[in-house]
């Protein structure tokens, strides 16, 4: 099937690098390979930048003054820091960086395998692999794939919970030290009130970014991790209802991409508020008092993703009108 690049920057060109993954839109196996290879690139970036920051880290100088990008996140998770947020051991950072580099190699190899050795279309593999072949207008199969993604995200949320509660704890800026979170908040009224901006019976424009204690942070991750895993199981077993498909049509890849970009934009905007105003999640010891530059970057990325949503949503309507 020919891939149309009409109304894109790749229109009227035969340059494969400019057309990008649009060439693979109907090749489920090769698109999976590109997906895995992309994850490998992200892992490689994380690992290489972490190692680079370890090599140039200067003890006694705050991380934010050294323009660190990833080490503050690791320090926030309680790795290598002691009282007052002082870095007492950079070896955990080095190990984490190496693990990411190893993971990037594995993912890169997996991506190359699916591109060059595996069938271009998963259905042709047969067996269990064929179960993951999809058509863009098959909501049941897309629900199967979505479900597995949600379960993985849920496990990711619980990794933070395990680190905070059982494996060394995380950094608490309010006591300026690392501690175990032994009593996370389970009360649904407390946790879900943040979604509508209710904090201590008062409304705040900050919404969930108004959280000011790690018990609520970890309790929220327990809730969201559970919801993600249960939601993943639901989507694996139950196809989207007809009324859902009317609100969020599932007809082509452009629609799926537009929904993903809209979710990404939402996460970026929420992250920007957290970065700018929340010292509990972004301790000033590691990120500094003034984080306007970091927050602005998050806003710009969110706006870019939102523009992408409108672009691909329009592309989807164009494709649907051509089909009709």
Curated annotation (Swiss-Prot):
Primary subcellular site in the record, as a coarse category: membrane
Transmembrane segments: 31-51, 68-88, 93-113, 222-242, 256-276, 292-312
Localization (cell): Cellular thylakoid membrane
Cofactor binding note of this UniProt entry: Chlorophyll a.
Entry membrane topology: Multi-pass membrane protein
Taxonomic superkingdom: Bacteria
Function summary: The antenna complex functions as a light receptor, it captures and delivers excitation energy to photosystems II and I. The pcb genes are not related to higher plant LHCs.
Protein name per the record: Chlorophyll a/b light-harvesting protein Pcb
Disulfide-bonded cysteines: none
Biological process annotations from GO: photosynthetic electron transport chain
Cellular component annotations (GO), alphabetically ordered: photosystem I; photosystem II; plasma membrane-derived thylakoid membrane
């Amino acid at each position: 099937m020919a891939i149309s690049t009409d109304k894109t920057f790749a229109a009227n060109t035969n340059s494969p690098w400019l057309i990008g993954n649009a060439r693979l839109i109907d090749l489920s196996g090769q698109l999976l390979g590109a997906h895995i290879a992309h994850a490998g690139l992200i892992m490689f970036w994380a690992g290489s930048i972490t190692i680079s920051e370890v090599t140039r880290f200067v003890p006694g100088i705050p991380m934010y003054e050294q323009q660190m990008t990833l080490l503050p996140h690791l320090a926030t998770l309680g790795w290598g820091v002691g009282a007052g947020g002082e870095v007492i051991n950079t070896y955990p950072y080095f190990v984490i960086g190496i693990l990411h580099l190893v993971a990037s190699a594995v993912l890169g190899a997996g991506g190359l395998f699916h591109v060059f050795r595996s069938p271009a279309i998963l259905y042709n593999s047969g067996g269990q692999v064929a179960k993951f072949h999809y058509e863009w207008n098959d909501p049941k199969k897309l629900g199967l794939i979505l479900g597995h993604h949600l379960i993985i995200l849920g496990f990711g949320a619980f990794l933070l919970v395990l680190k905070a509660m059982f494996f060394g704890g995380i950094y608490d800026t309010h006591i300026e030290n690392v501690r175990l979170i032994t009593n996370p908040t389970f009360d649904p009224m407390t946790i879900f009130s943040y979604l509508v901006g209710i904090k201590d019976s008062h409304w705040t424009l900050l919404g969930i970014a108004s959280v000011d204690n790690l018990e609520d942070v970890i309790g929220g991750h327990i809730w969201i991790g559970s919801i993600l895993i249960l939601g993943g199981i639901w989507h694996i077993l139950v196809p989207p209802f007809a009324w859902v498909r009317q609100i969020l049509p599932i007809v082509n890849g452009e629609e799926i991409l537009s929904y993903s970009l809209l979710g990404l934009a939402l996460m970026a905007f929420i992250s920007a508020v957290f970065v700018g105003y929340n010292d509990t999640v972004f301790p000033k010891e590691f990120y500094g008092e003034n984080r306007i530059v970091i927050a602005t970057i998050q806003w710009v990325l969110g706006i870019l993703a939102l523009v992408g949503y409108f672009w691909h949503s329009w592309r989807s309507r164009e494709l649907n009108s051509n089909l009709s």
